[in-house]
Amino acid sequence: MIQNSDSATATLLPRKKERASGPVSVLAIGSANPPNVFHQSLFPDFYFNITQSNHMAEVKAKFTRMCAKSGIKKRRMHINEDILEAHPSIRSYHDNSLDVRQDMLVEEVPKLGKVAADNAIAEWGQPKSNITHLIFCTSSGIDMPGADWALMKLLGLRPTVNRVMVYQQGCFAGCTVLRIAKDLAENNKGSRILVVCSELTLISFRGPTEDHPENLVGQALFGDGAAALIVGADPIPHAENASFEIHWARSSVVPDSDDAVTGNIKENGLVLHLSKTIPDLIGQNIHTLLKDALEEMFDACNPSSFNDLFWVIHPGGPAILDAVEEELNLKSERTHASREILSQYGNMVSPGVLFVLDYMRKRSVDERLSTTGEGLEWGVMLGFGPGLTVETLILKSVPTQAFKYF
């Protein structure tokens, strides 16, 4: 009972929202990319031509070597020659260009997210009115109201949809949004959550400078893309089609790694600092992170069983994938999905790991494997990014006989 100022009494009502019964499932996945394709072997010439930097011969030679070793064959980007010619401040390293970038990003990031969301909703096969929550994630531009609001308008979602906007989390955020969606779905019976990650390199594209060699790493790796998922518990029989279950999720910060990955919004856009120590930091800590996850999930951690799990790893770059593979003694096929997405799209920041998840389930069906997780039952999803933050999820696959994609 509560006593108010007028000495009247009121009764607290019991909590009415029920928890879900079963585990949270991925019910659909959609993706999208801009139309402009850049082949990695040709990108150094394009990059140094468009930024008028061919006089920096040694820097160009270094960049060419970086692109050759990137594990990337091609990338998709919103930017093209026409955009960069029309807005020369973007292609300069030092010019003030934040306003120009922002004006484009606040329009284009939600638009690309909408294409991915439309694809996910089409696969899901249920009316948009059944969406109860929207989570939107981007590190590309900031505005109020945010990209979540813009996407709600573009999709024609109900104005009462519960929205969560996740800004500036970087490469690990594809896992973060699934951790948030898991908590929402578990605690709100019948909820259906639309999760969208959309990123454009327009926020960080700029010409080379000898003062910031790390800038070249980002220019060699990053690509544009959007991914969308429908997430919910207790799939409706014969109406919804689960491809994975999310059973455990946690966020961790690697010790003594504060400056390994940082991004700062400046007048010339998002300036990234990517340390050479990132792969070593991940390699040195991956055993501890996985031990905690697997012990809590399975009451035991057997390092020899790592190859009995499927691996959905953020395709951040070949050195990161090499570090995980080597430290865990993984067979090369365990990182195939991540390397394939890196090869075809580059590092798309938050959507990248979700592209890996989509690729894995479709390949598993196409190759007639027994489960959506490459024929294996349990798997690990890993995201790495600023902090140095590591997101870890434990997933369970479903039998491919029970899963269909169109």
Swiss-Prot record:
Pfam families (UniProt xref): Chal_sti_synt_C (PF02797), Chal_sti_synt_N (PF00195)
Molecular function, one GO term: phloroisovalerophenone synthase activity
PROSITE patterns recorded: CHALCONE_SYNTH
Domain of life: Eukaryota
Swiss-Prot/TrEMBL catalytic activity: 3-methylbutanoyl-CoA + 3 malonyl-CoA + 3 H(+) = phlorisovalerophenone + 3 CO2 + 4 CoA
CDD domains membership: CHS_like
EC nos: 2.3.1.156
GO BP annotations listed: polyketide biosynthetic process
SUPFAM superfamilies, A to Z: Thiolase-like
Alphabetized InterPro entries for the sequence: Chalcone/stilbene_synt_C, Chalcone/stilbene_synt_N, Chalcone/stilbene_synthase_AS, Polyketide_synthase_type-III, Thiolase-like
Top EC class for this record: transferase
UniProt-annotated catalytic positions: 171
Transferase recorded as keyword: yes
Keywords (A to Z) from UniProt: Acyltransferase, Transferase
Function: Produces 3-methyl-1-(2,4,6-trihydroxyphenyl)butan-1-one (phloroisovalerophenone).
Family stated for the protein in its record: Belongs to the thiolase-like superfamily. Chalcone/stilbene synthases family.
Protein's name in the database: Phloroisovalerophenone synthase
Organism: Psilotum nudum
